């Protein structure tokens, strides 16, 4: 009896851009796309991490690593110019980069932090998606895919112990961006979907807790997680899902979807 083995689809000739690609989930996604034969572009604001990841992934495939502040349109435009120069076209965009808030409720929210989180987590995906679709539409046979990385906080307030105002509001916005993009460009050969992640291991989120969080927000997080403890998802599994969703068999009919990636957790607490 033969054992059925699953393989990632071949992405030879495809080019994928991953924001926040120098660490955590972004790095895992980059590795998965390199293994699938794709040209991979990673960008990250952390220059040292970009250099380290670039050196680590050297030899795995065709890689372009850039230090970019994705909140600045001029730097994003330069990134797309660099992609065009090296790989000619972009086929897949994964909006993965994000920063944390401090679990502040609306009465205590810091307007400056709000603006910063908004810029990274929502405005930047808009800018990147804008330039991505403009380039994709110029291709002779447009077959583009945009994947937005969202979370359980996009579903309901405090779901998954997530953020009471800033991140929750912005993740809802990211879902709106996903559906709007999918609705307008689906008939033009560009799909846009979102992954609504639960708890994942192997990320940089623990760094955020070193900067201090709202004490009551931290308490709520503990209460929710102790009520129905989620099973964490491995970044490798999420990365391979991104590859399949981008170009895998059967996924070409999936557009505008918000896919829960949490081992069924939101089916219990959602």
UniProtKB/Swiss-Prot annotation:
<feature type="binding site">
    <location>
        <position position="171"/>
    </location>
    <ligand>
        <name>NADP(+)</name>
    </ligand>
</feature>
<feature type="binding site">
    <location>
        <position position="18"/>
    </location>
    <ligand>
        <name>NADP(+)</name>
    </ligand>
</feature>
<dbReference type="InterPro" id="IPR002347">
    <property type="entry name" value="SDR_fam"/>
</dbReference>
<feature type="binding site">
    <location>
        <position position="69"/>
    </location>
    <ligand>
        <name>NADP(+)</name>
    </ligand>
</feature>
<protein>
    <recommendedName>
        <fullName>Short chain dehydrogenase/reductase dpfgG</fullName>
        <ecNumber>1.1.1.-</ecNumber>
    </recommendedName>
</protein>
<comment type="function">
    <text>Short chain dehydrogenase/reductase; part of the gene cluster that mediates the biosynthesis of diterpenoid pyrones. The first step of the pathway is the synthesis of the alpha-pyrone moiety by the polyketide synthase dpfgA via condensation of one acetyl-CoA starter unit with 3 malonyl-CoA units and 2 methylations. The alpha-pyrone is then combined with geranylgeranyl pyrophosphate (GGPP) formed by the GGPP synthase dpfgD through the action of the prenyltransferase dpfgC to yield a linear alpha-pyrone diterpenoid.</text>
</comment>
<dbReference type="GO" id="GO:0016616">
    <property type="term" value="F:oxidoreductase activity, acting on the CH-OH group of donors, NAD or NADP as acceptor"/>
</dbReference>
<dbReference type="Pfam" id="PF13561">
    <property type="entry name" value="adh_short_C2"/>
</dbReference>
<comment type="similarity">
    <text>Belongs to the short-chain dehydrogenases/reductases (SDR) family.</text>
</comment>
<feature type="binding site">
    <location>
        <position position="130"/>
    </location>
    <ligand>
        <name>NADP(+)</name>
    </ligand>
</feature>
<feature type="binding site">
    <location>
        <position position="96"/>
    </location>
    <ligand>
        <name>NADP(+)</name>
    </ligand>
</feature>
<dbReference type="GO" id="GO:0048038">
    <property type="term" value="F:quinone binding"/>
</dbReference>
<dbReference type="GO" id="GO:0006633">
    <property type="term" value="P:fatty acid biosynthetic process"/>
</dbReference>
<comment type="pathway">
    <text>Secondary metabolite biosynthesis; terpenoid biosynthesis.</text>
</comment>
<keyword id="KW-0560">Oxidoreductase</keyword>
<keyword id="KW-0521">NADP</keyword>
<feature type="active site" description="Lowers pKa of active site Tyr">
    <location>
        <position position="171"/>
    </location>
</feature>
<dbReference type="GO" id="GO:0016114">
    <property type="term" value="P:terpenoid biosynthetic process"/>
</dbReference>
<feature type="binding site">
    <location>
        <position position="204"/>
    </location>
    <ligand>
        <name>NADP(+)</name>
    </ligand>
</feature>
<dbReference type="InterPro" id="IPR036291">
    <property type="entry name" value="NAD(P)-bd_dom_sf"/>
</dbReference>
<feature type="binding site">
    <location>
        <position position="200"/>
    </location>
    <ligand>
        <name>NADP(+)</name>
    </ligand>
</feature>
